[in-house]
Every structure is written in C-alpha cells, then in structure tokens.
Amino acid sequence: MIIEDRIKAFEKLGDFLMDFCNENPNSNHLLETIIKSSSSYNGWFTSSNIRSSISAICNNLRSAKLSSWLSSYSIPIEAKKNVSIIMAGNIPLVGFNDFLCVLMSGHRAIIKLSSKDNRLFIPIIEELIKIEPRFKDDVKLVEKVENFDAVIATGSNESFKHFEYYFKNYPTLLRKSRTSVAILTGEESLDESCLLYTSPSPRD
C-alpha cells in the first residue's frame, strides 16, 4: 500500500471520529455505548475526557497535517516488520499515536491493550479496516506479546525495568513515568483552568 493510500484511510478515519464528536446521528453507536459504560471499568474515563481525547486525535488526522509530518522522513520500501505495541491506560486512546506511526511506516501493529483501556480501540480499528481493508492483515490484538521484530512499550517505572530486561535483544522504544508542570498566565478562564485536570497523566 502506498503512503498516499494510508493517508487517505486515516483522514477518513478522522472524518468518522469527527462525526462522532459532533454527535452525528449516523456515527458509530457501538463507540457511543462503550463510552457511556467506560466509567464502570475505569473511573478516570469520563465521557467528556474520552471525547476530548478523540477530538484531539481526529484534528491531527487531516491529509495536510499527515503529509507534512511524513515529509520529514524517508520511509523505505522494505519487508514489513511486526512491531509490538504495549499500550498504557492512563489516558483514553493514549497509544493511538504509536499505532498511527507503525501503520504509516508500512509495518504491522501487534497491539497489547492496557486492561484500563481495552475497549475504545476496538471499534476504531474495525472502522479503519472497513475504510481500508488492506489494513486487516496489518493490525492484530493480542493478549501475549510474541512473534515480533521490535517493541514500543509504555508503562510505570517498575514496568520499564521489566521491559528493559525482557526486550533487551530487540529494537525498542520504551517509556516510563514522567512528571510535568503547567505554566498559567492568569488570563485563563475557570473552564480552561479545569480542562483535562483529571486522569493519572504526566500533567497531574
């Protein structure tokens, strides 16, 4: 699949997600149902929190943005690699960018979802494959990480130590816990100050 076809597919996925965020009556009802029940399996995942994450994702899935981003890289045409993605679950769909990067680079995404966020991705992956069926063989959800060529893993500091040990013989991109601060100017509205304060993310 050429890069232009991948860009078109993800742009259409962005349109699908935008319709959902705009509450289009023709949008995916399964995704709506999952969001409404999300707090029962992860109390941090409120409906507004999830919709905010989805909105941020679909805003970046524009053809111009994707083309500009990819133009900075030389993507070689070579045999596909199986890239295992071990996703975190601190923010809704936090592993989407890793998923996007793997598929855009022409490789296969072997995904192990976090137990804290193991529902939202499914209807999104199904929609992407519906848009572009050639992705069907390039996306696989797994419970056990095996049969891979490289690893992208995100987790706690303790998980990071395990990742380093278990994947020491493979190409890896490993992430552990981070902390950050926000700088306020004093001109923020109350709504802006409160926005996205919740969830166990690096900004808290």
Task: List the model feature ranges, each with a label.
Residues 11, 189, 203:
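Residue-level marker of positions within ordered structural domains that often coincide
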Residues 21, 58, 101, 194-197:
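Generic recognition of cysteine residues
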Residues 197-204:
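Conserved small/polar residues in nucleotide/adenosyl-binding loops
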Residues 35, 42, 46, 92, ...:
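Sparse, context-dependent recognition of short Cys/His-centered cofactor- or disulfide-binding micro-motifs
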Residues 66-195:
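Rossmann-like NAD(P) dinucleotide-binding subdomain of oxidoreductase/dehydrogenase enzymes
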